[in-house]
A protein has these predicted regions:
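Cation-handling catalytic/transport regions enriched in His/Asp/Glu
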Residues: 102
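Juxtamembrane/interface segments of multi-pass membrane proteins
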Residues: 133-135
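Non-cytosolic membrane-interface motifs at loop->transmembrane helix junctions
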Residues: 1-3, 64-75, 137-143
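Hydrophobic cores of alpha-helical transmembrane segments in multi-pass integral membrane proteins
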Residues: 4-29, 38-59, 72-93, 107-130, ...
Length: 176
């Protein structure tokens, strides 16, 4: 149960909150509409559907039913689909607008968070493969992967959201 709970804290709580910040900040900072509203819905709901089953990929070497291990491996690899849907949508929204991103410190943080999101999810899908996991699971690779997700993606994106929204709330600019 720990892996379902612990893994889903990141995937079903921190990830949607981080993506909500990105979906809010990037279109406003670039003064451009979201590239595709339909893709945002597909990305969100496919994330919710696929992510709920991946906690068992940390238990491939223990006596857990094979069907559960198989579902977790398939869904872990399938996470590439919702992640790329979300990132393509966000990155196409800011396409040609990097000057506006560069001018806003909050948007820079959020864009950096989306890059970390790409890396942590590609890494996670790869780490769920049994042949890779036999090598990486009982070392600090897994700890580093968790830190990239929580600090690299969720933390950097949250800081970007704060940097973006605080001047709007207070009416005063932030100086860096």
């Amino acid at each position: 149960l720990l892996w379902f709970y612990g893994h889903n804290i990141f995937g079903l709580l921190l990830t949607p909150m981080g993506l909500a910040v990105a979906y809010y900040v990037l279109p406003i900072a670039t003064r451009s509409p979201l590239w595709s509203h339909s893709l945002s819905l597909i990305g969100f709901w496919s994330l919710i559907i696929v992510y709920t089953h991946i906690g068992t990929h940390h238990l491939l070497q223990v006596p857990v039913p094979t069907w559960l291990k198989t579902i977790s491996i398939v869904d872990s690899v399938a996470m590439v689909i919702p992640v790329m849907i979300v990132l393509i949508n966000l990155w196409y929204t800011i396409k040609g607008k990097l000057g506006e991103i560069h001018a806003d410190i909050g948007a820079k943080f959020v864009l950096t968070g989306t890059i970390w999101y790409f890396f942590v999810n590609i890494q996670g899908s790869m780490m769920a493969l049994p042949h890779v996991q036999r090598i990486t699971h009982f070392n600090n690779w897994v700890v580093g992967h968790a830190h990239i997700g929580v600090l690299g993606f969720a933390g950097v994106t949250a800081l970007g959201g704060l940097y973006f929204i605080l001047p709007k709330i207070t009416g005063k600019p932030l100086y860096s």
